[in-house]
Design a protein with these regions (language model features):
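Active-site neighborhood of divalent metal-dependent phosphoester bond hydrolases
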Residues: 46-48, 54-169
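Active-site environment of divalent metal-dependent phosphoester hydrolases
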Residues: 12-14, 40-42, 66-72, 126, ...
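Short, basic, glycine/proline-bearing loop/turn elements
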Residues: 31-36, 79-90, 192-199
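Acidic, His/Gly-rich catalytic cores of divalent-metal-dependent hydrolytic chemistry
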Residues: 133-277
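Divalent metal-coordination and catalytic microenvironments
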Residues: 8, 37, 64-65, 102, ...
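N-terminal active-site segment of His-dependent metallophosphoesterases
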Residues: 1-55, 68
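Active-site-proximal beta-strand elements of phosphoester/diester hydrolases
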Residues: 2-10, 116-122, 246-247
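Residue-level marker for buried hydrophobic side chains located in beta-strands
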Residues: 5, 34, 61-62, 117, ...
């Protein structure tokens, strides 16, 4: 049995199937970890979501920002833009089943036997892993209960941008969601900058990748994440010294779709079909 962590798919179903062929995926013996953003912007979001759901216990998923956008759009809380490719999901016969399944996925997943934790974007440098797990559960429980609509209506926004134990209510939950699904760069004091999406090393000097912040409290935890399609183009790519494993390699943007085998940390990649469009 092997376990593979796969980066952002965003509806690139053909590339996903090519990647599974590349790793000789065996549904009975292997397990797939998906680092969020299963859907949106790519051409086959509905097929992708149906397939991953069909994998059952062979798949572990964490929610990404595009997955949350789909959930919000399904409740008419967020508009669908011209760039979105989720309308086919919302009009599908099994839309409710798919959305309900997605809502029950976690924001953070840990396998203590394998020694890895997976999130979509990152973890606030000020948080311990136990703290991060508790905050993930806090928001996951809301996504799965009757308070979800109010939660989704208040989920969007860039403030507060720095953690404090005194933050309460929707502001607190918004910060938690932004860390798990949107974070890339921080200032030295841990304030989030959610606008900058460049490769590490190309940012202004006042910003630091979240995982490279001095005294990050999860430095001893192996963390898999996606979200950052440009991260491997940075001037520094020695991620292991930070104990992080970024698996988004920009498939949607004509890059690659990548899987890391957790057993030996070997990387497998296939070329994006989007580069041929």
């Amino acid at each position: 049995m092997s376990t593979y962590a796969i980066g952002d798919i965003q509806g690139c179903y053909t590339e996903l199937q090519n990647l599974l062929n590349e790793i000789n995926f065996n549904e009975k013996n292997d397990q797939l970890w998906f680092a969020g953003d299963l859907v949106n912007r790519g051409p086959k979001s509905l097929q992708t979501l149906r397939f991953i759901k069909s994998l059952g216990v062979s798949a572990k998923i964490v929610l990404g920002n595009h997955d949350l956008h789909l959930i919000a759009a399904s409740k008419n809380i967020r508009p669908i833009s011209n760039k979105d490719t989720i309308k086919e999901i919302l009009t599908a016969d099994d839309a409710d089943e798919l959305i309900n399944w997605l809502k029950s996925r976690p924001l953070l997943f840990t396998d203590t036997d394998l020694g890895f934790t997976m999130v979509h974007a990152g973890i606030a440098p000020q948080w311990t892993m136990d703290t991060a797990k508790n905050f993930a559960k806090e928001c996951e429980s809301i996504l799965q209960n009757e308070k979800i609509d109010d939660f989704l209506m208040h989920m969007y926004g860039d403030t507060p941008n720095i953690w404090s134990d005194s933050i309460e209510g929707y502001a607190r939950q918004r910060f938690i969601i932004n860390c798990f699904t949107r974070i890339r760069f921080c200032t030295i004091d841990g304030a989030l900058d959610l606008d900058i999406k460049v490769a590490p090393g190309s940012q202004k000097k006042s910003l630091i990748p979240w995982y490279a912040l001095p005294n990050r409290k999860t430095i001893d935890n192996k963390i898999i994440f996606g979200h950052w399609s440009t991260i491997h183009f940075g001037v520094e790519n020695n991620f292991k010294k930070y104990n992080v494993y970024p698996v988004d390699t920009g498939c949607l943007w004509g890059g690659q779709l990548t899987a890391m085998r957790l057993d030996d940390e070997k990387i497998f990649s296939v070329t994006s079909e989007q580069s041929k469009l």
